[in-house]
Amino acid sequence: INYSIASKYLFTGSVRYDGSSRFSKKNRWGFFPSGAFAWNVKQEDWLKDTKVVSQLKLRLSAGQTGQQDGIANYSYMPIYYLSTNSYDRYNMGSAGLQYYYTPGSYDPDITWETTTTYNVGVDFGFCDDRITGNVDAYVRNTSDLLNEVITPMGANFGNKILTNIGSMQNKGVEFSLNVVPVQTKDWHLSIGFNGTFQDTKITKLNTSDDPRYKEMVVDISKGTGSKFSFHKVGYAPYTYYPYQQ
C-alpha cells in the first residue's frame, strides 16, 4: 500500500503471510509486516525555491522477514530409520533381521527465523543534481536463529538437535556520493564513491548462560580434520581458527 500527501509525506506498508510445510501446523504460517515513511523536504515551501538544494528526502522504515533455510523436510516429526547394514541387524541364525530403530533428534516446535530491520536514511542533491548521494544506517536483529544443541545421552542415536535458540545482530552504515564535475554538450564526466561499515555478532546461542557451552563448531568439507570455523556469542558467524604463519 502506498499513500502520498501533497507529494511531501509518503507512506508505504506491506504484509507477508508465508507458509511452509517444513513446520508443524501450529507454526506453519508466519506473519511478517513492514512499513516506511518518507518526508520529501524539498517540497516544503521554505525549501522549494532554493536552487542550491535540488533534492532532500528523509526516510524511516521497519519490517520483518522470515526464512526457513537450513531446515530439512519433516524436521518437526519423529522419523524411524530402517537398519541397513550388518551392524544394525538382529542375528537370527544365519539371517540378520532388519528393524526400525529410535527416531532421530527432532523439535516439534521448530519455526521461522525472524529478522527485524530498522532503517533511517537521507537522499540529497545539490546544484541541479551535480552532487547527489544518500546515507543509510540500519540495525538488523535476527531471533529464533537455528542452532544445534547437545541432547542427553541415550535419547536417540543423534547427539545434537536443530532448534530455534539463537539470536544475532547486524548493524552498519552505507553511503554513496556522485559528483558531475564536467557536463557540457560534448562531455560528461561522473565520479562516484560508495562505502559500507558493518558489524555483525551473535548475541545468543543457548537458552542459558552455560559456561560449559563455548561455541558451535561448523563442519567443512575438506581440510585437516573437519572443523575449522565456529559460531560464538560476541563474534561474527563463521569465525575461523587458522594457523598463524
Language-model features, listed with the residues they occupy:
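Short, intrinsically disordered, charge-balanced linker/junction segments flanking boundaries
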Residues: 239-245
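Glycine-rich, Lys/Arg-enriched anion-binding loops that position phosphate/diphosphate groups
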Residues: 236
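Extracellular/periplasmic, surface-exposed regions of secreted and cell-surface proteins
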Residues: 1-232
